[in-house]
Amino acid sequence: MKNAIVPFVFACCLLISVDLAHAQGFLKVDGKKIVNEKGENVLLRGIGLGGWMLQEPYMFELSDAAGTQTEIKAKITALIGQKNCDEFYRFFLTNMITEKDVDALKKWGFNSLRLPMHYNLYTLPIDKEPLKGQNTWLEPGFKLTDNLLSWCKKNKMYLILDLHATPGGQGNDRPIADIDTLKPRLWESEANQQKTIALWKKLAERYKDEEWIGGYDLINETNYKLEGNESLKKLFSEISAEIRKVDMKHIIFIEGNQFANDYTGLTPPWDKNIVYSFHKYWNPTTIETIQKYLDMREKYNVPLWMGESGENTNEWFRDAVKLFENNNIGWSWWTIKKIGSESSLMTISKPAGYQKIVDFWTGKGPKPTVEEAKATFMDLAEKVKFENCKINNEVMDALLGKK
């Protein structure tokens, strides 16, 4: 009987969930719910900004050519030179996510964004620091984040910061964290862990008074053998403690090991403003598949957030969103834009010379000239703009119930 009642109760909560156009104040934890400062239930409906600060090869049809973003950049540099590569990336980062994207997302019905951050836009790798143990802060990442936040504030949308690629990398899946296997991982290096802690404190200092920052998603999808998750719990606790020295208000989102699914050793919550964030891919959309998270919510009186899902059919999307919302679980979908894919919210069209470059990189064709290759990459930096992307209305319909 209890399992039958719970979805009904949460469905009733949705009927009184706040309209964010009139919401005020920081998000916070209230028992099993995420609420605003008026105590109104807030159901997050969001999109992950994948491919912007961190380019996973598959999102650009480059899986056969490169394993990580670093490898992509190295190949581009070898083809067109460092100066041209830097120019391309400046335009790409400027154009991939703009105010037009955020305005449209708000208009369509989304109320939040999840920003997958690459640490190297904010600080130097440990082996490039002028002094060992020093943290050199870089302007590009902070400026991009500031701009994005200003667009979110204008649209009254929450922005959740997600450290997608940590110093050293948090797992064995190389593409999602831009991992160099010749360098120490996050879990093998105290210096990388200290830089991660310092970065989160720096972010918290910068955004502590920003009510449209929805919270801090500390580490994306750890996937590493950690006995009892003790090292993960230790690092989460240390990051949380440093954040709380400067910011007592924002939610801290905690993902489990094994791609945000294993919470061994990560309960009970050690902070009064923690939300547990699970991810869901490639399994049925039945309540049984999320029951362990519902049980965790019930046992520890803590909210849940489904921080990442996607890469499936529109029918699956629709059923998954229904499952989450019937159980008062906010969500963030993956992802906003990809090349040649209709499972993302928008599709980036492939530049005319793009396949020639891919063929060269995969040993299937001749090398393009510097001029040809640079023109192709600069065209890509134009094609990622909102106004040049194809909107996949079927995906939007599946997520938001539009007609």
Report the location of each language-model feature.
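Bacterial Sec-dependent N-terminal signal peptides
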Residues: M1-Q24
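A general structural signal for short secondary-structure junctions and capping/turn motifs
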Residues: K2, E37, V321-E325
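Extracellular glycoside hydrolase catalytic/binding regions
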Residues: F26, E188-I339, S343-T362
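N-terminal module-boundary/linker segments of secreted carbohydrate-active enzymes
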Residues: A23-G46
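Extended, alpha-helix-rich binding/interface surfaces that flank or overlap catalytic cores
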Residues: G330-S332, K337-K403
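Generic structural signal for residues positioned in beta-strands
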Residues: K33, G46-G48, V275, G330
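Active-site mouth of glycoside hydrolases
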Residues: K38-L44, L49-I251, G256-T264
